[in-house]
Amino acid sequence: MKKWTIEDSKELYNISGWGTSYFGINEKGDVYVTPCKDNTQIDLRDIMDELALRDINAPVLLRFPDILDNRIEKTASCFQKAKEEYGYKGENFVIYPIKVNQMQPVVEEIISHGKKFNLGLEAGSKPELHAVIAVQAQSDSLIICNGYKDESYIELALLAQKMGKRIFIVVEKLNELDIIAKVAGKLNVKPNIGIRIKLASSGSGKWAESGGDASKFGLTSAELLTALNKIEEMGFHDCLRLIHFHIGSQITKIRRIQTALREAAQFYINLHKMGYNVDFVDCGGGLGVDYDGTRSSSSESSVNYSIQEYVNDCVYTFVDAANKNNIEHPNLITESGRSLSAHHSVLVIDVLETASLPEMPEEFEAKETDHQLVKDLYEIWDNLNPRNMLEDWHDAEQIREEALQLFSHGIVDLKTRAEIEAMYWSVCHEINNLAKHMKHVPEELRGLDKILADKYFCNFSLFQSLPDSWAIDQLFPIMPIQRLDERPTRNATLQDITCDSDGKIANFVTDGHIGNVLPLHPLKKNEPYYLGVFLVGAYQEILGDMHNLFGDTNAAHISVKDGKYCIDQIFDGETVEEVLDYVQYNPKKLVRQLEQWVTKSVKEGKISLDEGKEFLGTYRNGLFGYTYLQ
């Protein structure tokens, strides 16, 4: 058999496809990250070893702020290239919608790295607006106000505008115009009004229904005309400065984007012909991330276009429409939060143990005294070959079903059942291996890989750290971060440590396609085996829930300084005490209750005084400990 190489691992896990030049495999067989343009490589295994020395254990979220900087710069440079190519005379504004990841350390890094590109922020709720107004220090950066709004929301936005913030209030529903007029009159402010338009065009992929006629937000063309009449009646003609549209997140097909842009451009042209000097067009989100690295529109986890192609289409469409109608080019806004933030975070989890289906030892031979079903199944196993494979598969299934029925009726004993089950799974393994060499695998054999896969139990909560994997079957690239110079000999699915059968992952990127199993290595004694889950920087942290009371994981910010990595900040994961407090348990009261119970048990002679002290000490220490296994 050919010796396994690093190149084989690169191909198997398709790291060159989804890694987007940020991730690779070094000569040691470890995954590295290259956050900066100077190509400094940071070994993820080295980071985990250093964190372990600091008593920071997996699961841990590794954030690389330099990647945020690179993603912002890449988007801005794509606009600059498009500007030069198409003669675009407007300004472009990169906006980060904080709903993508509202964690203060992440937003702080984005603002810091985005200053040189005048990056703005978007708020979609009242709490988000409170955060955005306070952290966005640059007065010339845009703040876009989306989502449902009440009077206090609009008052906060207009007061901030009055004090110098560059704020646009985007009307999602007609009644919001009345609130804006009321508050603006009270504050004596001339509001910057935007209108979200409900396009007929829709996106593609998991969020296609975010656009089109079924979309939740936006005004139809008829409602837009009603809104324009209201604007005239209110004396806000000059206040309408922006139109906004959004056809969905993670748009997989560039053609859908092109269609939406052409439709939106006509709204821009028509509004100008009606006398409205709209000077901003907010193209919303939708710029996708290639999670599986296939660059295919047929996959909901991929996209068939680049950032440059997306930007080119945005710029060209509005330049072309404006030029043909002798209208000024609009200032273009993009809200591409997923594209900006997905790559910068890697979740590292450790494998606790594995479980596999029982198999019969190769040296086993059926004896005359064995049950007839054992002898029949042994004969099938002993004579398996490609010609009779499917017939043998059917016979083996029938024997197993019969054995289970006989066991339920007390006719077959436990030893016989165990032998038949182990031999059945051995037959399945051999049939699966034979099927891999067939040009056309029978339909009923195609699911054997998944059925026969080992279970790798990992120290994390799917619901806390990868909620989209559970909720919408979002695919994330997953692979070992070490031993990649070794052949992975086990096929596995991943199980989390929650008490929920949904807490598993059984869809993976392998060999450039989506598979039901992940090739992994056997565990080694006293050696941690780490898996990296990549591209998790968008939505996952903020959408995570506390199923089984597993809290936020440890997190670390790692940057490059003078050609070496530096762990800038460490954020401890939530403790048992903190998560109990979320669900309204008072930890101090819990301790007092335990003290009373232990005192009573000591007095009754059930435990000794020392045992009582040890129990209370263990309990108190546990309250301040990590919610995950240590």
Which positions does each model-derived feature cover?
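A non-catalytic, amphipathic alpha-helix used as a structural packing/dimerization or gating element
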Residues: 66-74, 226, 263, 313
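Charged (often Lys/Glu-rich) extended helix/loop segments that serve as interaction or gating elements
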Residues: 313, 319-630
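Short, glycine-/Ser/Thr-/acidic-enriched flexible segments
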Residues: 30, 38, 67, 101-103, ...
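Active-site-proximal beta-alpha core segment in soluble small-molecule metabolic enzymes
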Residues: 87-282, 289, 293, 304-309, ...
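Flexible, glycine/charged-enriched surface loops at secondary-structure junctions
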Residues: 58, 62, 84-89, 274-278, ...
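Helical (often loop-to-helix) elements that flank the catalytic cores of nucleotide-handling enzymes
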Residues: 299-314, 363
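Low-complexity, highly charged intrinsically disordered N-terminal segments
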Residues: 20, 25-102
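Charged, compositionally biased N-terminal leader segments and the immediate start
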Residues: 1-31
